[in-house]
Amino acid sequence: MLTRQARLLRRIPPPNAVLQSGLQRRHRSTDRYSNNIHTSSTQNAPAPVYDTPIREKGMTLEAKERVRAHVRKIQSSASTAAASPAVRPQPAQHFQAAPQPMPTNMPRFESDSQVKNGLDYSFIGLSGGQIFQEMMLRHDVKQVFGYPGGAILPVFDAIYNSPHFEFVLPRHEQGAGHMAEGYARVSGKPGVVLVTSGPGATNVITPMQDALSDGVPMVVFCGQVATNLIGSDAFQEADVVGISRSCTKWNVMVKDIAELPRRINEAFKIATTGRPGPVLVDLPKDVTAAILRTPIPAKSVQPGHSPYLPSNPLNPSSQPSDPLPGDADLITEAAQMINKAKRPIIFAGNGVLSSPEGPKLLKELSDKGRIPVTTTLQGLGAFDERDEKSLHMIGMHGSAYANFAMQEADVLIALGVRFDDRVTGKVDTFAPAAKAAAAEGRGGIIHFEIQPKNINKIVEAQIPVLGDVVASLGELVPQIEAVDRSAWIGRCKATKERYPFTYTPSQEGQKLKPQEVVQELDRQAEALGKEKFVISTGVGQHQMWACQYYRWTEPRSWVSSGGLGTMGFGLPSAIGAKVAAPEKYVIDIDGDASFSMTAMELATASQYDIGVKVLLFNNEFQGMVEQWQDLFYENRYSHTRMTNPDFVKLSESMGAKGLRCTKLEDLPRMMKEFLEYDGKRPIVLECLVSSEHVYPMIPAGKALHEQLLHPLLRNGSE
């Protein structure tokens, strides 16, 4: 009598039977699929080649002999096959050539026959990866930053050795995201990122949040596990759509190959519409590996032209079409308030830089109305700081004279700003003179802004003008009257002379002062031409000194992390900026702590001959944190001191040239060597600097006029 276990074993077929049964089912399934294709393509379809019936206990003798003959044919031809190359060819690199904009972004149809009855047939027979490549071409994408992985390989295979793209492979996906940001900030075009699923996608979360905070257009494409595996905790599966929901303007998972072109178009349009920002498109592997078999709506393959698309500064002829206009009556009301003002001030932000016309209109407004100008950190370069009406940057570490002027102005003209806490200080005490003038009906706050949620979110505006800032400026400037405001300009000038940016110069035998290094860079950049320079920074004290002691004169010459304050931003963003503008000097002013977070991207610059220059401040401290510990935590330096590597040797090990400056008398010569070094190779100039505080400084919870001044100025403060 059989045991229960024996009876169960008898029910399990032998392994070869299971394999044979599976092959038979697969063969029958393939036959049905092949028959369906032939039937749909023609009425007189020939019979499938493999039409010999499969019997339950094996193939017929005729079928077996046909298989053996096929194997013999393969074996006989194997000896004559060409050997595969030992090293796959690399795409040509053209980073040192100035980018040439395409004449049009419209799709390039081979013939009218590809569109019939509103349906497009041009993508039939292409894989999802090939469709991705074609859509990038239609969106004039020339540079892609990313890192491959299993889930995104169908796309990487489609763009392999493509002559249409310059692909930059970073050492970390976060580097790819910041490179795309730097590229977008300098070029005005959205940066494109291509990464795999799981950690590849989550490593781009920080750059996406950074781009969202600062209004940078970026399109991130990430791989995903196959749709039938979603939710199964598959290898490198992550709910990146859920994770990125709060740090993108829009995100989507493409679930069918037929919707891929439409989703790509939507991504580019949303990233560049209104206030620019990041978007994410999740691409399951079975979608990018699939073949499109049916026509799709013709409109879905045509790049959408956003009416508010920022212009490309590298192509001045590219202008936004039909920008969102501001309310004409409100603009007229704003002009009337400005014309009556005795002490107006212009507060310019990143929104002014959305078009090449923005800085021009800002200058015209300031010159015509004799109005002083201050900027946000991200507005640097919108107004020439050599102009006598420039008050430089405002805020926590802005100029003392800009902060004082903001508190005294009776009309505040805010252009494309968010009024974040680093600018306003204590909100209740921000711009008191303008608020008092508003209560008396003779002044107030005018806010030009494209994003509705920023209107009256922090600071109440008496005249809120919702719309494209540059378009609104174009309507405002003709209505501004020439008014004599010499008394107000004179007061601002006197305050500027009384409270300048100040530091104690280094003495012989002492370490360099970081301010001295920035001033020397500014002096030599002025001699070479400021229009030839782009400056990026990390985050920390060095970032603030760059704002204070470098005179900003050119739009889109400043690349820095403002809203999120991302350490490690400087070097990868400089690489992206250099890719966008290879003809310019691109300099990353960085601190030792910030640089160390993404220092390996120096190897990326070496690999691709991207000639970025790193001006590195080494004080072996996390400087800004140490400053707060000094001022507010009784000098308790909790985990802010660092032991650094030899940055010169580290740079040389990654193919870059390394220099080190320790003396003030050597600084001009070494700065000159630094700037004149080969524009195709990266270089690092390490400057050993003393530990300093950044002044002025507005302590948390204090008003703009309650700023901490440099000790040399405090006796004369008001």
Curated annotation (Swiss-Prot):
Mg(2+) binds at D592, N619. Its cofactor is Mg(2+); thiamine diphosphate. InterPro entries: Acetolactate_synth_lsu (IPR012846), AHAS_TPP (IPR039368), DHS-like_NAD/FAD-binding_dom (IPR029035), THDP-binding (IPR029061), Thiamin_PyroP_enz_cen_dom (IPR012000), Thiamin_PyroP_enz_TPP-bd_dom (IPR012001), TPP-bd_CS (IPR000399), TPP_enz (IPR045229). Residues 32-45 have a biased composition (Polar residues). Its main location: mitochondrion. FAD binds at residues 275, 397-418, 449-468. GO terms for biological process: isoleucine biosynthetic process; L-valine biosynthetic process. Residues 1-53, 75-99, 301-326 are annotated as: Disordered. It comes from the Eukaryota. One of its GO terms (cellular component) is acetolactate synthase complex. It is found in: Mitochondrion. It is an enzyme of class 2 (transferase). It catalyses: 2 pyruvate + H(+) = (2S)-2-acetolactate + CO2. This is Acetolactate synthase, mitochondrial. It comes from Cryptococcus neoformans var. grubii serotype A (strain H99 / ATCC 208821 / CBS 10515 / FGSC 9487).
